From Swiss-Prot:
L-serine binds at residues 230-232, 284, 384. InterPro entries: aa-tRNA-synt_IIb, aa-tRNA-synth_II, aa-tRNA-synth_II/BPL/LPL, Ser-tRNA-ligase_type_1, Ser-tRNA-synth_1_N, SerRS_1_N_sf, SerRS_core, tRNA-bd_arm. The lineage of its organism: Bacteria, Bacillati, Bacillota, Clostridia, Thermoanaerobacterales. One of its GO terms (biological process) is seryl-tRNA aminoacylation. Its main location: cytoplasm. This is Serine--tRNA ligase. GO terms for molecular function: ATP binding; catalytic activity, acting on a protein; serine-tRNA ligase activity; transferase activity.
Amino acid sequence: MLDIKFIRSNPDVVRRAIELKGEKADLDRLLLLDEKRREMLVELEALKNKRNTESDNIARLKREGKDASELIAKMKELSDKIKDMEQELREIEEEMEKILWTIPNIPHESVPIGESDEDNVEVRRWGEPRKFDFEPKPHWEIGEALGILDFEAASRVTGSRFVFYKGLGARLERALINFMLDLHIEKHGYKEVFPPFLVHRRSMFGTGQLPKFEEDAFKVEGTDYFLIPTAEVPVTNLYRETIIDGEQLPIYHCAYSACFRQEAGAAGRDTRGLIRQHQFDKVELVKFTEPDKSYEELEKMTRDAEEVLQALGLPYRVVAICTGDLGFTASKKYDIEVWMPSYGRYVEISSCSNCEDFQARRANIRYRPKGGGKLQYVHTLNGSGVAVGRTFAAILENYQQEDGSVVVPEVLRPYMKVDVIRKEE
């Protein structure tokens, strides 16, 4: 959420951000309400001062034994007017708040201008896509043939866009989770948390999922609980309504969680395989930083996520996301896209975002600067480190052999206890 003072002072900047991100927000109405609110506050203050004066006059007349009935009647009229104005002010503030919720974060000046993912800008690549001497198969065919992925059983048990990982498939999923966590904890300095998979509405609001993306969330009927779409939600809200000692910053957290998404806008896209599931595993990275360090920390976070793919030997590219594809909460975002041979293209496997103080204002996360001074909002960052199911898919496709087996990446062998995944007899 943006500061109303910033919006008031920079309406053209905010209007441009709304336009660049393709959002709909009634900025003119907000500014009109803000002006009216400030005028009413001045008037209310004057009326309350007048009420205090009249109250003193009534008390004086009573002490002197004089008739105060006329002043008491005026006092009642004044109090009623104040009460009515306070109610109107509350209604104005509620309407302002609802409009504020619809205003997106301001894109950083370094973000490419564009309307869609076609305007995103490639920053760098790592690794060379493998040249196959046979026709590479898609990961779902490989997994089903090996008996390690079962989409048909999941469809019977739950529905479409779910999967059973079986045998060495379950072990590979678990190995990837543990490998990613170990890398981020032991090498990159993140502290692990294991969060709840259910959060309440205020937490979803704090990270910006609500109210805009409610249709994509799974809500538990009859409760205020939502299944988390990403561990970003509980981990960021770990510090909601708190004041952090500036000496503790930056704070790095990593977390494994299952993630749950309706994928409401994804009809017809990636309908087969692991790329777009209603439930999927992910290792998330979350940072809390001082404002002047957040962009440096974004670069480091992106490199941390990249290192997962480098260690696994998976070719990828990093893309700077343009304004129209940036999303509601981010000021700047990088996507990491892994090479998928059967697709013949790179597929998103991680997004790393700097939200500046946008989420911190919504969740009221502040810090006390080193050496004292006025409380400030932290900057929050989040990134996938990385999506586990998509990494599973990328390994099957990039490490597949002509006989249908899959070579296990070397760094995973201590976790897997096998070098090659073959069909179990």
